[in-house]
Amino acid sequence: MRGAYYVTIALLVVASSQISAEFGHQLQAYDHDVTAADDAVAETLAKRSLRGSRDVSNDVAIEERTKYSNVIEDGIEMLLRAAEALKEMPRAAVAVKDMPRAEEAVEKMAPIAEQDLLKNVIGADEASKRRRAPHGISTQRTLALPFKEWNTELKQMRGGSVLKKYRSKIKSVHQAFVDLCDKDLNPTVTETALLWGMFDWDVKSYSASAHKHNLIRLAKRYVHKDVVQIQSDDLAWNRWNEVSIPLRIGALNILLNLHYQRWVRMYNIFEQYQSALIGTPVSLELSLGGTTGTSSATALDKHLEVPMNKASTSKGKSSVFTRSSKRAFDSKTGTTSPSSKHSKMQRSSSPLTESTTSGDDPVFTKRSRHGVAVTSLSSISN
């Protein structure tokens, strides 16, 4: 209470000084309840002001700071917080009421865990029954060769053919492969033989990276064939030479990606059904060539359930085909007879010529209508 007493005294003194100032009088200073004499020097009370308040022109700046002002402010804040806490108490009570008990939570968790476990088991069983798709080569890759890659001479475009070991079965394999592919792919006999040859490589060469590199080279050769076709038309070739080099490179890359995506799609399909397409000749003949009234794709689908015989090997190199038998099997009588189909195929004249290979990369392309052309893509810069 001493602080309040001092505050009251100070207010009275200030009020008295204001009144005396209005009447032109000055109050006498008191010190310890002692009144100064009439002839004594009058002294005023020392002014106490808050820090930084001397610049204020009103009388509030003369008030003395007390510690109770901070206490009052803290009390007001505590009251506000208490009021907010009282408002939140009903909400907290409702939340506690709705909170699930431990027993109820345990009862609900058991059925959920059983359902998830049953769902996972069913999903795993269905996945095991489905045919596992191979990884294959991604179709999301976009090729963009620079000018340096295009400004190089490619090898001579040569006529391609089916290798001798594939000739006896290439027609049935090609027909089954066409049925498996989409209509927009429409693979040719030579393309089927080329894919067959890629999967008939040595084990060391059988890798996705090597196949991917080979598919890029095949797509690049197809672009070369497109350029050869443009050269055969004088008007189209003149227009091509009028285009700037960057635009030519962009057009070549577009064609390259079109051919590459087509090759990748055919490659992935052939890899997925590899065991059925290039299985042993006898089982392949019975499932594809021996069926009547049904499509090759249906026969191939049934053939997927038939286990394959072991492939023959020679000189350390694996081959998915055994030597073709010269005797045909009669399913009705259960006897074998000499096959005339094989000799007819050998005597028949094939429109495909013998292939020439470079290393492990055989060239299987159809002979151009305009003949063999030796062209360099470096001419695009001329």
From Swiss-Prot:
Residue interval(s) of motif RxLR-dEER: 48-65
Region (Disordered): 308-382
Span of the signal peptide: 1-21
Compartments in which it is found: Secreted; Host nucleus
Gene Ontology CC entries for this record: extracellular region; host cell nucleus
Major place of residence: secreted
Family statement: Belongs to the RxLR effector family.
Protein task: Secreted effector that completely suppresses the host cell death induced by cell death-inducing proteins.
Protein name: Secreted RxLR effector protein 118
